[in-house]
Amino acid sequence: MGGSDHTKTSSQSTLRSLSDEISSLTDVVAGFLESNGHPERSLNSTDSVRLSDAPEDVEAARRRLVTALHEMTLLTMSPFEAVRDILLEVSSLPALHAISHFEIIDHVPLDGEISYAELARKINVPQRRLTRMLRAAMSRSIFQEPRPGYIAHNSLSAAMVHSKWLRYHAASTMENFLPAAPKFVEQIERFGDRETRCTSPAGIAFNTETDCIQYLLSQPKHQQVLVNLMKHTGEISGMGPQHLTEHYDWPKASDQIIVDVGGASGSVSRAIACGVPSVRFVVQDRADAVRQGESETPSELKDRFTFQEYDFFQTQPVKNADVYFLRWILHDWPDEDAVTILRQVALAMGPTSKMLIAERLVLLPGEGDPWDQKIATSMDMFMMAFNGSERTLEHFQSLIENTGEAIEISRVIRRPNGVQYSLIEVARKDSER
């Protein structure tokens, strides 16, 4: 790494030391790109680029470079300017909302340009307002104006062309989270520490006293966004099943069973099945997900897969399975509900059963990669809008203890670099390990 110290913290950083570190890290990243035939990076490019697939040492250097550049920016600005800049970011939200809502991404040619006047006619938006909002987005490096009166894609706006997940994430942020954001304080003042899916900031925003997630899923516009967001989650670097298949010792015998609790259509279980060619799977979820899973499962796996309609707040019908697998389930729910979900699994576990929880582990400030910390705390705000939660390991430990069942964390498999979730294995206290 050219002798650079990648563990340096903000409190130790000075402008000169950061400058030296940035130069060293840039050499590592640029050297990798050049040696592997990547084109010179440019904000004006509209090519699809994924940099997170680099070797682990290069990826670590790249992530540290992003953090060091941010630290350099903060140290170069005055504290007043830095705080003002954070507040000014809010002003870009109306522009991002318009880009998503009016599907402007689709109306700007990927390789070319379009006048503001023609774009305004196409999407039926007043030209002056459209121009002002898009120029606000450009101040955040989204889109570009190659000549006066014309708009074109750049690398950031083109990313939403290439990534369906990013597009649906933008839509969900603007249509589902943004209305809830001003209601966080009101939720605290009205409900205090009462955290249910029916007392959430989003529930206040959408004026519903029911489970707000279920309310949104009942509205066609919101349902389409949420379903497609989940469908394309695999596009996100570090969210795929590779960590599961490479770092956990799954059962392998034909008489062993893995229960995928809330497993949607079973896509993750199918990925696991490729590495354990004999074990059987039971995938449990809502009726529509079960039907989808049955139709998507290839013929060579059908004899090993059972799909079962199941509400995970009710008694678990599969007893003594080898592994009960919960992937990205608990973070959707307040603590009381999460405890109920865990308890239903615990009551079904036999002496040698394991429960495997795949979730993001939130680190304390100053621990780990600042980039990961930013993602984790940001995602926690998204979850808080619906009274869900991203959790620390200690928080998971508390949930497990509160089940009142004789279960405990037996192992934690921390996520490797670039992966966004860890694995928490839970066993019965009287189990043989």
UniProtKB/Swiss-Prot annotation:
Q: What is its EC number?
A: 2.1.1.-
Q: What SUPFAM superfamilies would the database entry show?
A: S-adenosyl-L-methionine-dependent methyltransferases, Winged helix' DNA-binding domain
Is Transit peptide set as a keyword in this record?
no
One Pfam short name: Methyltransf_2
Gene3D superfamilies per the UniProt record, alphabetical: Vaccinia Virus protein VP39, Winged helix-like DNA-binding domain superfamily/Winged helix DNA-binding domain
GO BP: any one term: secondary metabolite biosynthetic process
Q: Where is the active site?
A: 331 (proton acceptor)
Cite the annotated pathway: Secondary metabolite biosynthesis
- Residues that coordinate or bind S-adenosyl-L-methionine: 285
On whether Transferase is a keyword of this UniProt record, the answer is yes
UniProt xrefs under PANTHER family: O-METHYLTRANSFERASE ASQN-RELATED (PTHR43712:SF5), PUTATIVE (AFU_ORTHOLOGUE AFUA_4G14580)-RELATED (PTHR43712)
Similarity annotation: Belongs to the class I-like SAM-binding methyltransferase superfamily. Cation-independent O-methyltransferase family. COMT subfamily.
Name recorded for this polypeptide: Hps1-dma1 cluster O-methyltransferase
